[in-house]
Amino acid sequence: MKNQDQALIFEMSKEGRVGYSLPQLDVEEVKLEDVFESNYIRAEDAELPEVSELDIMRHYTALSNRNHGVDSGFYPLGSCTMKYNPKINENVARFPGFANIHPLQDEKTVQGAMELMYDLQEHLVEITGMDAVTLQPAAGAHGEWTGLMLIRAYHEANGDHNRTKVIVPDSAHGTNPASATVAGFETITVKSNEHGLVDLEDLKRVVNEETAALMLTNPNTLGLFEENILEMAEIVHNAGGKLYYDGANLNAVLSQARPGDMGFDVVHLNLHKTFTGPHGGGGPGSGPVGVKEDLIPFLPKPILEKTENGYHFNYDRPQAIGRVKPFYGNFGINVRAYTYIRSMGPDGLRAVTENAVLNANYMMRRLAPYYDLPFDRHCKHEFVLSGRCQKKLGVRTLDIAKRLLDFGYHPPTIYFPLNVEECIMIEPTETESKETLDGFIDKMIQIAKEAKENPEIVQEAPHTTVITRLDETMAARKPILRYQKPTPVQV
């Protein structure tokens, strides 16, 4: 199938064509000049498309058919936990008492919403083993930055101004060193050993009196549990540093293990991942941060408290790092996460982890004969393959990903983590059936065979999508980085 053009809505515009009508004016007409100063009024008409209602419906329906989401198909994007989002979450989030309130309302009028927020914090405290939680951060990387700022404030409050370095593993999420840099730290990399885990000897080498924190994901980005976590925590704590938990992979340990029991001092969660807030479209997310007792004074203000008179926000926080987001976090996502936690209960959350781990190991073992398996051991919720053997045949991991598009699958994460050559990172989540997993596995096996027998079909993929192989060289050398006004076309 050749590339199919899809006109922009602006390109469909025809002067005089109308797609809506306004009700008859039943109030006195007011001129803009009487309400706004001239510098706030447009000098020229806005360039809005003039299209019919039918054109609008067909245009956006066509675009929606090109989208892929967890409601339309399998989404095995490693390190992203693209699980199904139960629709009961959406129903509850649309309750008028949640959907129609305003953050500037008096606290007495939103006690129900505040109770939900408080209860959610308490649930997250129990799930993570922390002592307190803030719901303010808007997403994962925002939570990382917030947690690091808390650690920075803690060290500075103790007069320890020389702790300027944050240690991250070579398999870490790219947001970890980025967040550390934005928080004012220098990042130091600790190597992985031959088993895909943090090398303890290298950790001992890089930890010193300048260490502010070690950032870890556990299980790590290779899908492997850091079995030496207690010793790692001891190494960092003995040096005066803090241990930070990146909650990206919490789906692998729900009701099985808690970061607080592993020795972590700070944790951020991704409610839009682990706790089924919808994600993948750019937001909104929710990245609550939990801390141990000695970091509570530095939590962003206000904090939500419960007294005999109800719920209220406490702004009297002299050591707080300040606000990290207007108002009180992305409330709608928090409602969805709360609904999910209450729906599942402790036993349900335990089953989430058990099935996520089972699905990942099943897929890994079925695919291992056809792709390189860098670390041949049981994984947790996700696993990493390598396309090294296919690369020797002239087929790159990128080609494999594009070939999957021909079969209607969203490709896994590729080329990450960076310490695995030709990396293919797969996370099936717990919500997928064996039949779905088998269908994807069969296509991956077919692609591996094609790489041997007919590599061109993989190298030139995709063949059935509306947009086929793009000119990567031209895109890199001559990217279009600025908006270009379209030329109207005949529709």
Curated annotation (Swiss-Prot):
The keyword Oxidoreductase applies. It catalyses: N(6)-[(R)-lipoyl]-L-lysyl-[glycine-cleavage complex H protein] + glycine + H(+) = N(6)-[(R)-S(8)-aminomethyldihydrolipoyl]-L-lysyl-[glycine-cleavage complex H protein] + CO2. Pfam families: GcvP2_C, GDC-P. Its cofactor is pyridoxal 5'-phosphate. Its EC number is 1.4.4.2. Keywords: Oxidoreductase, Pyridoxal phosphate. The keyword Oxidoreductase applies. The modification N6-(pyridoxal phosphate)lysine is found at K273. One of its GO terms (molecular function) is pyridoxal phosphate binding. GO terms for biological process: glycine decarboxylation via glycine cleavage system. InterPro entries: GcvPB, GDC-P_C, GDC-P_N, GDC_P, PyrdxlP-dep_Trfase, PyrdxlP-dep_Trfase_major, PyrdxlP-dep_Trfase_small. SUPFAM superfamilies: PLP-dependent transferases. It is an enzyme of class 1 (oxidoreductase). It comes from the Bacteria. GO terms for cellular component: cytosol; glycine cleavage complex. PANTHER family: GLYCINE DEHYDROGENASE (DECARBOXYLATING), MITOCHONDRIAL, GLYCINE DEHYDROGENASE, DECARBOXYLATING. The glycine cleavage system is composed of four proteins: P, T, L and H. In this organism, the P 'protein' is a heterodimer of two subunits. The glycine cleavage system catalyzes the degradation of glycine. The P protein binds the alpha-amino group of glycine through its pyridoxal phosphate cofactor; CO(2) is released and the remaining methylamine moiety is then transferred to the lipoamide cofactor of the H protein. Belongs to the GcvP family. C-terminal subunit subfamily. This is Probable glycine dehydrogenase (decarboxylating) subunit 2. It comes from Bacillus cytotoxicus (strain DSM 22905 / CIP 110041 / 391-98 / NVH 391-98).
